[in-house]
Amino acid sequence: MTSGAIADAPARRSAVSGVPQRLSAALAAVRAHVVRLRGPYGVAALTFGVYLLLSIRRYQHYQVPSWDLGIFDQAIRNLAAFHAPVSLIKGVGFNVFGDHFHPVIALLVPVYWLAPTAMSLLVVQDLLVAASAFVVTKAARTVVGGYSGVALGLSYAFSWGLQEAVVAQFHEVAFALPLLAASLTALVAGRWLTCALWALPLVLVKEDLGLTVVVIGLLVVLRSRGRQAALGGALAAWGAAWFVVAVKVVLPAVNGQGVWDYSRQVPWGTLSDPVTVAERLVQPTEKLHTLAYILGITGFLALRSPLVLAVLPTLAWRFLSDTPAYWGRLWHYSAVLMPIMFLALIDAIRAVRARPVSSRPSLLRAYAAVAAPVCATVAVMLTINGLPVRELVRPSFYRPDARNTAAERVLALIPAGSSVESDAGLVTYLTDRDDVYWMGRTGNPAPEYLLVDGRNGGWPTPPSDVVAYAEQLHPGTTYVKIFDTDGYVLVERVTG
C-alpha cells in the first residue's frame, strides 16, 4: 500500500463511521417528531371517533334536527351527476348557489361518486372537525407543552360550538374549521405567507367569511412590517372583494328573486343610529349569554389577544339579525368561532410567557399557567350539563325505540322514484331515492305521497288532519291515509 493510500484510510474510515452517526441522528429526529405529533394525532383520532359514533347513532335513530342535510344531499347529488346544484326542498328548480356562496361543496363530488348518501356528508364533517383539532392541538403543544397542549386540544375538540355543529348535521362551514385553525396558527407563529395562503380559500366556504378574511389580513398588517404588511393588506382586500362579489353579484344573479335572501334579515335602515345598533347587539339578553359562553370557554384569557377580533364579523351579522335562531348557542352558527377563540387563547398565553418575568403581572402569569386545566374543566362541565356528547354514556342512546321501527315501516311504503312532500322529520332519508319537497313551501307540484312527523317534524306545525291538509295544499287532488303510527302519518294521492 502506498503512503498516499495509507494516509487516506483514516479519512475513509471517518466518513464510513459518520454514516451510522448521521443515520442515528436522523432517526432520533424522526422519533422526536413522532412523539411531538402523537398528542395531536391522538386528539384528532378521539375527536373523529366520538363524533362519528354520535353522528351515526343519531342518524340511525332518525334524530334529524332540520332539513339542511337533505338540502346538501340533493345539491351535491346533482353536482355529482354534472347538473346544477338544485335542491327541491328549497324550491322547484332552486339552485343552492343562490342561497349561500359556498362553491367549496363541489369538493364533495368525488365523495358522492364513491358513496352517494347523506351519511357521507356526516363522515366528512367529522373528519374536518378532527383535522382542525389536530392543528389546534399541535399549536397548543408548541406554546404550552405536551400535556397542557393536549388538554387545550381536547377542550377545543369538544367545545360547545363544535358539539352543537355536529348534531346540527352537515353544513358548509365545516370546511372553514381546519382553514381557520391553520391560518391563525401561522399568524401566531409569524408565518405571514402561510397565514395568507390558508385564509384565501375561506371566501369560497360562505359569503360572510370574506369579512373574517378581512380581519385576518388586518391582523397581519398589525403584527408585521414592510412587505409582510403589504401582504396583509392584499389579503384584506381579497376578502372584501369576494364578499362584495358574492352578495352583490353572484347570489342575486343565481337567486331566483334577484336578491341576496339573507340581507332581508337585517333592518339596514335602523343601523345609521349608533344607539340602535348598540341595543340590537346586546338585546335580548340571550345574545349576552351567548357571548359569555364564547369568551368563557377560554377562561376569558383570549381577550388578551388581538386574534379575538376575528369573531366580530360573525357575531355582528348574527346579533344584528332579526332571526332568533342566530342569537343563541344551538345549531352550527358558533362553529367557526371555536378555532378563533382557542388560537386567540394560545396567542395570549404565548404573549404572557414571552414578556420578561419582571414585567408580567404575577396574577396574570399564574392564570396563564393554569389556562389549559381551566379550559378543560369548562369543557367537561358544559358537556355534563347537557351538551350532545353526554348522550354517548346513556345506554338508551344505543337502543332503538318504537319510533325507529315506525320510521322504517313508513319509509318502506314509499317506492323509490316517487315524488314526496314532507316536513323536516324524515326528509333526509328520502332524498337519495325520491323527488322530495318541503311541505312548508308554496308552488310544489302535487306529490304522490305526503309524509308528516307529528312529533319531531319541526316546521310547519303538524296538521291534525293530514288528508285534509294535503288536499288543501293541492286543490283538485284526493289523498288517502295509508299509515298512522307513533306520530308518523303518510297519505297517498289517488286522484288529481
Regions found by a protein language model. Give the residues of each.
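Signature aromatic-anchored transmembrane alpha helix within multi-pass, membrane-resident enzymes
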Residues: 41-45, 236-240, 352-387
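Extracytosolic helix-loop segments that constitute the early lumenal/periplasmic catalytic or substrate-binding loops
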Residues: 71-95, 103-104
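Start-transfer (signal-anchor) and selected internal transmembrane alpha helices
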Residues: 1-53, 192, 227-235
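Short acidic/glycine- and proline-prone juxtamembrane loop motifs at membrane-interface regions
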Residues: 165-173
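Membrane-lumen/periplasm interface segments of specific transmembrane helices
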Residues: 50-54, 61-64, 78, 226-312, ...
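Membrane-interface transmembrane helices that cradle and orient dolichyl/undecaprenyl
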Residues: 175, 180-194, 221-222
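Hydrophobic/aromatic-rich transmembrane helices and adjacent perimembrane loops
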Residues: 309-360
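Transmembrane-helix signature of polytopic, membrane-embedded enzymes
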Residues: 41-42, 119, 131-158, 177-178, ...
